[in-house]
Regions:
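Short hydrophobic beta-strand element within catalytic cores of glycosyltransferases
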Residues: 320-323
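A short, well-ordered alpha-helix in the C-terminal region of glycosyltransferases
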Residues: 356, 363-377, 389
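Conserved donor-binding/catalytic core segment of Leloir-type glycosyltransferases
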Residues: 210-231, 237-240
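Aromatic "clamp/platform" in nucleotide-sugar-dependent glycosyltransferases that forms part
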Residues: 303
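Conserved acidic donor-binding segment of nucleotide-sugar-dependent glycosyltransferases
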Residues: 335-336, 340-347, 356-361
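Nucleotide-activated donor-binding/catalytic signature segment of Leloir-type glycosyltransferases, i.e.
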Residues: 266-282
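Donor nucleotide-sugar binding/catalytic pocket of nucleotide-sugar-dependent glycosyltransferases
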Residues: 70, 146-216
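Short alpha-helical donor nucleotide-sugar binding micro-motif in glycosyltransferases
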Residues: 99, 290-295
Length: 409
């Protein structure tokens, strides 16, 4: 990375997130806002463009008063097609007005509402930078599934194709090596990003006292993520059942997160008694970090994935990791040698990997050392500085350039 300082300017950021407001100001439930807000020190001003729920309320992640929120008309979700279409003219007017108050705009998608922001930004002669966090067709296929949602899958392919076409002309920030390759090939540069929500202070606090820690009895397993189909949380219970058959009472699983499969999972977990604990959604911060520090092994079982932020959190805590080898997981961990990787949808392989880690102290120590070193390289501050430099145009990174910065030497 060069030492040049990003040109100071006002940055607008659009990503599909609902904001709420009360007497304390704006807030949201989406953890990624922590990364967005980390860009604030690099610009003269930050303007968040997004829909605002008319119902007052407070969410876990507050937006500071120093950051402006440009409110768009509210709709329930991206599934609310009628609401989106009905409010489209008002949405375009609000976007146009917000773009008049910024010098550049980072448009994160692809979602239906992100394309108008990018097009209007170009029309207003602003510097437009795209952001891509997931493979949209793959996400829709796993998240929705079934013939009923075939039209949505078709729309996802069209939307991604349009976003990729636009990315040939404007700079793009892509999360993970796979998306960086997918969006490269045009005239514009692509920044390969590993998103981290773990600050330098977090790494220090999480890693403190983690070295040479032995596993407890029971061995504490931790999983953090949405309880939705594409995250395959049922694999956790299937693997635990196999482990219980071989070594009864040796393992205890804590599941952090909520989602559409939560009730089903709770019912299935009844047979394990106290060996499975559900914590619901725990916001990124001290309470979640306490759970990381109290655990022995981190388990990630998604069947499709971008570059999961929870891996950075687990590595910062010095937790050895077992994860499915999908999407950007291997690249997110480093070279793939920093964890045990298993095929998706394979509870036998998952159980075997967990048992191996639980019984091999030297392997856990190696993973712990590599993980903490990587977390220190990929802090929130460092990654936000890279994105700020890229958006400002002071750096032109090509796919693959990030590799030397993303792998501990």
């Amino acid at each position: 990375m060069s030492d040049s300082t990003p040109r100071r300017s006002r940055l607008g950021i659009y990503f599909e997130v609902p904001y709420r407001r009360d007497e304390g100001g704006f807030s949201t439930h989406v953890p990624f806002i922590r990364f967005v807000l980390a860009l604030r020190p690099h610009f003269d001003g930050l303007v968040l463009v997004g829909r605002v729920d008319p119902e007052p309320g407070r969410e876990p992640y507050a937006v500071p008063d120093s950051v402006e929120v440009a409110a768009l008309p509210h709709y329930a979700s991206l599934k609310d097609t009628i609401g989106i279409v009905g409010k489209f003219p008002a949405t375009l007017r609000a976007i146009w007005g917000a773009l008049g108050r910024v010098d550049a705009v980072w448009v994160i998608g692809p979602v239906p509402t992100s394309l108008p922001v990018a097009v209007l930004g170009l029309a207003r002669k602003k510097r437009v930078v795209l952001g891509v966090r997931r493979d949209l067709p793959r996400y829709v296929r796993h998240h929705l599934g079934g013939r009923r949602w075939a039209p949505a899958l078709g729309a996802a392919y069209v939307l991604e194709a349009l976003f990729r076409l636009l990315a040939r002309r404007v700079p793009t920030v892509a999360v993970g090596a796979d998306l960086a390759r997918l969006y490269s090939g045009g005239r514009a540069s692509v920044l390969e990003l590993a998103v981290s929500l773990v600050s330098e202070a977090d790494v220090h606090a999480l890693s403190k006292g983690s070295h040479n820690r032995d596993v407890g009895h029971p061995v504490e397993l931790l999983s953090v993520g949405r309880l939705d189909p594409e995250k395959a949380p049922e694999m956790l219970l299937k693997a635990l059942a196999l482990l219980e058959k071989r070594t009864p009472g040796r393992y205890r699983l804590t599941i952090v997160g909520d989602g559409q499969l939560e009730n089903q999972l709770r019912a299935e977990a009844d047979r394990f008694g106290d060996a499975v604990r559900f914590r619901g959604h725990v916001p990124n911060g001290p309470e979640l970090f306490k759970l990381y520090r109290a655990s022995d092994i981190f388990v990630h079982v998604a069947r499709t994935e971008g570059l999961p932020q929870v891996l950075s959190e687990a590595q910062a805590a010095g937790l050895p990791i077992v994860a499915t080898d999908v999407g950007g997981v291997r690249a997110g961990l480093g070279s793939g040698a920093e964890a045990l990787l298993v095929p998706p949808n394979d509870p036998e392989a998952l159980a075997a990997a967990i048992a191996r880690l639980a019984s091999d102290g030297d392997l856990r120590a190696d993973f712990r050392k590599l993980g903490i070193a990587r977390a220190r390289m990929l802090t929130l501050e460092r990654q936000a500085a890279r994105v700020a430099a890229f958006i400002s145009g002071s750096e032109a990174w090509e796919p693959g350039d990030a590799a030397e910065h993303l792998h501990p030497g």
